[in-house]
Amino acid sequence: MEALAVDGLPEIHEGDDLAALLEDRVDFADGDVLCVASTIVSKAEGRAFDRESFPPSDRAKAIADRLSTITGEQKDPRFAQAVLEESEELLTESPFLLSVTRFGHITVNAGIDRSNVPGADLLLLPEDPTASAERLSSALGVPVVVTDTSGRPFRYGQRGVAVGWAGLPAARDWRGETDRDGRELGVTVQAVVDELAATANLVAGEGDDGTPAVVVREWSFGDHDGSDLLFRREEDDIVREALRQWTFDGHQQ
């Protein structure tokens, strides 16, 4: 398997034909998977905004005031309003905003980016990343994973995750197959789109040296059952329920 950065992409603007820009730079082949950063998908889809686009509600002002008190830094209620508008639910309002996005992804600040947004203040995630992936996959003829960088519970550091995908299942189901000793596997479901996203993030890098698209070549899903169930169902998610019941005590570590 190879993971190859796509070099030479220009700064992306609203209305740019992302598929054409990628096709000009990559000779796609059977077995390729394109991993593309949500940032350039969002830019092409016009998801860059100024803070003034989000007049703050009373709730946003209260959130910003509380976060300012906790952190000792002035927080902008317009940013809090943007997070509220992009969230189906806020699982925590302090010491940070942990959002359930409208497409089911759970992440800090609804995944809103405040870096690498020339001419604007905020870059929102694609409105429907899987629909975005489907359009790119249809145009390019290869599976597509739309990636984002996200933190991890219980561990420091960030990694690439999938927020949308098309042309391949999200997960590979090993249940019912056997290990090397002949024992049947009962619980193993491999989140392949997340693993592809993490691979792409490792190759793409971050900051000024980063590239927003990576082609994973000669990787195969194999002869396994697949599933598109990536986001845990609410009724099965004990961590989500625990967060709803948790109250921040005012002491930031």
From Swiss-Prot:
The keyword Nucleotide-binding is annotated on this UniProt entry: yes
Q: Does the keyword Magnesium apply?
A: yes
Recorded GO MF terms: coenzyme F420-0:L-glutamate ligase activity; coenzyme F420-1:gamma-L-glutamate ligase activity; GTP binding; metal ion binding
Q: Where does a divalent metal cation 2 bind?
A: 149, 206
Which reactions is this enzyme annotated as catalysing? Answer: oxidized coenzyme F420-0 + GTP + L-glutamate = oxidized coenzyme F420-1 + GDP + phosphate + H(+); oxidized coenzyme F420-1 + GTP + L-glutamate = oxidized coenzyme F420-2 + GDP + phosphate + H(+)
As recorded in UniProt, its EC number(s) are 6.3.2.31, 6.3.2.34
Query: What are the binding positions for a divalent metal cation 1 in this chain?
Result: 113, 148
- Enzyme class label: ligase
Note on how the cofactor is bound: Binds 2 divalent metal cations per subunit. The ions could be magnesium and/or manganese. Monovalent cation. The ion could be potassium.
Q: In which pathway does it act?
A: Cofactor biosynthesis; coenzyme F420 biosynthesis
Report the InterPro entries cross-referenced here. F420-0_g-glutamyl_ligase, F420-0_gamma-glut_ligase-dom, F420_ligase_CofE_arc
Spell out the Pfam families in the cross-references: F420_ligase
What does the entry list as the binding residues for GTP?
A: 9-12, 38-39, 43, 116, 204-211
Q: What keywords appear on the UniProt entry?
A: GTP-binding, Ligase, Magnesium, Manganese, Metal-binding, Nucleotide-binding, Potassium
Q: Which GO terms describe its biological process?
A: F420-0 metabolic process
Q: How does it assemble?
A: Homodimer.
Spell out the PANTHER family in the cross-references: COENZYME F420:L-GLUTAMATE LIGASE, PTHR47917
Describe the task this protein carries out.
Catalyzes the GTP-dependent successive addition of two or more gamma-linked L-glutamates to the L-lactyl phosphodiester of 7,8-didemethyl-8-hydroxy-5-deazariboflavin (F420-0) to form coenzyme F420-0-glutamyl-glutamate (F420-2) or polyglutamated F420 derivatives.
Q: Which family does it belong to?
A: Belongs to the CofE family.
Q: What is this protein called?
A: Coenzyme F420:L-glutamate ligase
Name the gene behind this protein. cofE
